[in-house]
């Protein structure tokens, strides 16, 4: 593998100190509140999700502060329960899921050459449902009894009215139902947009990998989220109308766990697959190569989605009420298509002319972290090993490596990657590198040691421990790492604010110089309906062909897929050069 140092582009003058204001003061706010433009809604999703991410991170810092030393107890046990309940809920359902739709709204219509999404007003309605539901659930902290305190899984009978009588629990249930409805409607919109609004020439196997992953994720949303909504409505019915749905005689706790995890495990892939797609967009651009194994990546994504519906009960090994061999085998099997993706990402970088701009740094951080999380997942997939570490900090470390490693690293890769496209300005590269290294080091310092804590027997969800337990040293290290992680977010927020106002102005359609998909064939930022003119779409790399038409024949000859000339997605590249270069003088 060869690597070349990142070449700093010549500084461009900031021709304006701040994006020009059109209309009277306050008109921008009014525009964002009433908008149906998917790019604006994407920004709203991303900003709102980042806000909830900061709230969830603050809750995590309070928990880590509590656990830094034994006997501190600046939080009561009840407050600690509320913190870990809302931390998990916010991070998974109010940050990770909506940030998927933020990227989907901002980028997917551009990538398929569509002027808008299929249902613009429904799209806006979906966002406001999410924001209203998330605010409702989080508002439990303002009630006299505090927020929900039964864990983000809300297992019965703990979540029934006898054990959790507060208003905060009801707000949590209804907030998740409302927010989940917004997610379902957003998925319907994305599926319809991909099926109905692709540009001429944009066949399914010419779509970018990110678009494929959003399509498959949206199908998973339609399969999983209605189950969560039904389970929550049944829980509300039990709490207030005496439904007895979760009584032991009718299935009880095991029935609820099956319903919840039939949603819960597909949810893990609902919030993972889109970020796999982001990484699949970032790596080729900064490796200066086409994606290795495009078709294999698509089929691997389909395989992961299918298998994700068949592994939910591996969360229930400890109950003894599930068929262990089947669910263990399915869990091991899901590692195969995931391994295919790793093979393709590494194959894309192999012998590439790699440059290490901030998006690429976060993409590599994603690969390293997610790989380590997957290795601990192999341990947990085996029931005999899982029984020894279940409900310990080993499990906490595993799912943070998998989820943080996937969602947060890929989120930042996507933001740094598409920020110039959406705003017309670059983010600060030095602050970006500082952000990456503080995030990477802070994360691994926080969660690597938690594997050892779990192996030594520290249970999760405990608000305190004894000095004689021997957990003090590793907990102190973990807390130091968590505060370093918190500092990294200050860097990111300042970078985003500073770059939006004063960042280096983008003057070209493709600021990274090697963009493949259609969003790099329009202006930065794009016009209201995305394109002034669409280039011809002959393969899965239309923007690259537009900007480098003289490379068409070589790209066909060196295609990884080894298609025969005249067949497959790259066949049109063999047309006479007079046709292939017809759009040479095209400008977007």
Curated annotation (Swiss-Prot):
Pathway: Energy metabolism; oxidative phosphorylation
Keywords of the record: Cell membrane, Copper, Electron transport, Heme, Iron, Membrane, Metal-binding, Respiratory chain, Translocase, Transmembrane, Transmembrane helix, Transport
Membrane topology label: Multi-pass membrane protein
GO BP, sorted A to Z: electron transport coupled proton transport; oxidative phosphorylation; respiratory electron transport chain
Top-level taxon in the UniProt lineage: Bacteria
Entry's EC annotation: 7.1.1.9
Binding-site residues for Cu cation, renumbered to this chain: 265, 269, 314-315
EC main group: translocase
Binding site for heme a3: 398
Role of this protein: Cytochrome c oxidase is the component of the respiratory chain that catalyzes the reduction of oxygen to water. Subunits 1-3 form the functional core of the enzyme complex. CO I is the catalytic subunit of the enzyme. Electrons originating in cytochrome c are transferred via the copper A center of subunit 2 and heme A of subunit 1 to the bimetallic center formed by heme A3 and copper B.
Protein known as: Probable cytochrome c oxidase subunit 1-beta
Native organism: Nocardia farcinica (strain IFM 10152)
Gene (UniProt): ctaD2
């Amino acid at each position: 593998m060869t690597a070349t140092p990142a070449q700093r582009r010549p500084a461009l003058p900031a021709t304006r100190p701040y994006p020009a204001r059109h209309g009277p003061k306050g008109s921008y706010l009014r525009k964002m509140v009433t908008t149906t433009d998917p790019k604006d809604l994407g920004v709203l999703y991303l900003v709102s999700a980042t806000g909830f991410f900061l709230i969830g991170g603050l809750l995590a810092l309070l928990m880590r502060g509590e656990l830094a030393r034994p006997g501190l107890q600046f939080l009561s046990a009840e407050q600690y329960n509320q913190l870990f309940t809302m931390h998990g809920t916010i991070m998974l359902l109010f940050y990770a899921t909506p940030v998927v739709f933020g990227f989907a709204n901002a980028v997917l219509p551009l990538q398929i050459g569509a002027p808008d999404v299929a249902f613009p007003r429904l799209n806006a309605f979906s966002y406001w449902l999410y924001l209203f539901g998330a605010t409702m659930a989080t508002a439990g902290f303002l009630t006299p009894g505090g927020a929900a305190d039964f864990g983000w899984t809300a297992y019965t009978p703990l979540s029934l009215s006898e054990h959790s009588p507060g208003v905060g629990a009801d707000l949590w249930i209804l907030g998740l139902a409302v927010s989940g409805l917004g997610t379902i409607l957003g998925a319907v919109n994305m599926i319809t947009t991909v099926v109905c609004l692709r540009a001429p020439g944009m066949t399914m196997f010419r779509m970018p990998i990110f678009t494929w992953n959003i399509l498959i994720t949206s199908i998973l949303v339609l399969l999983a989220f209605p189950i969560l909504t039904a389970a929550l409505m049944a829980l509300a019915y039990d709490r207030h109308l005496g439904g007895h749905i979760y009584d032991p005689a009718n299935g009880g706790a095991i029935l609820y766990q099956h319903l919840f995890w039939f949603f819960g495990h597909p949810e893990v892939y609902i919030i993972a697959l889109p970020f796999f797609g982001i990484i699949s967009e970032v790596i080729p651009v900064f490796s200066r190569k086409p994606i290795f194994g495009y078709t294999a990546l698509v089929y691997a994504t389909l395989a992961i989605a299918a298998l994700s519906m068949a592994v939910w009960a591996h969360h229930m090994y400890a109950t003894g009420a599930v068929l262990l061999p089947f669910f263990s085998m399915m869990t091991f099997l899901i590692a195969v298509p995931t391994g295919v993706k790793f093979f393709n990402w590494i194959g894309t970088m192999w012998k590439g002319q790699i440059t290490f701009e901030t998006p690429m740094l976060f993409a590599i951080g994603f690969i390293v972290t997610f790989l380590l999380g997957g290795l601990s997942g192999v341990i947990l997939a085996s029931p005999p090993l899982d029984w020894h570490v279940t409900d310990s900090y080993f499990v906490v470390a595993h799912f943070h490596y998998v989820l943080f490693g996937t969602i947060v690293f890929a989120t930042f890769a996507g933001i740094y990657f598409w920020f110039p496209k959406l705003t017309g300005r670059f983010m600060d590269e030095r602050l970006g590198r500082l952000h990456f290294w503080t995030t990477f080091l802070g994360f691994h310092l926080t969660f690597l040691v938690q594997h050892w804590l779990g192996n030594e027997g520290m249970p999760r969800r405990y608000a305190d421990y004894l000095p004689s337990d021997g957990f003090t040293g590793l907990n102190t290290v973990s807390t130091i790492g968590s505060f370093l992680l918190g500092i990294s977010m200050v860097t990111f927020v300042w970078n985003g604010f500073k770059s939006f106002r004063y960042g280096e102005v983008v003057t070209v359609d493709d600021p990274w110089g090697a963009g493949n998909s259609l969003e790099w064939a329009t202006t930065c930022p794009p016009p209201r309906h995305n394109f002034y003119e669409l280039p011809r779409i002959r393969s899965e790399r239309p923007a690259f062909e537009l900007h480098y038409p003289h490379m068409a024949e070589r790209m066909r000859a060196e295609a990884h897929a080894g298609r025969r000339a005249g067949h497959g997605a790259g066949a049109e590249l063999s047309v006479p050069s007079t046709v292939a270069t017809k759009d040479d003088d095209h400008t977007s």
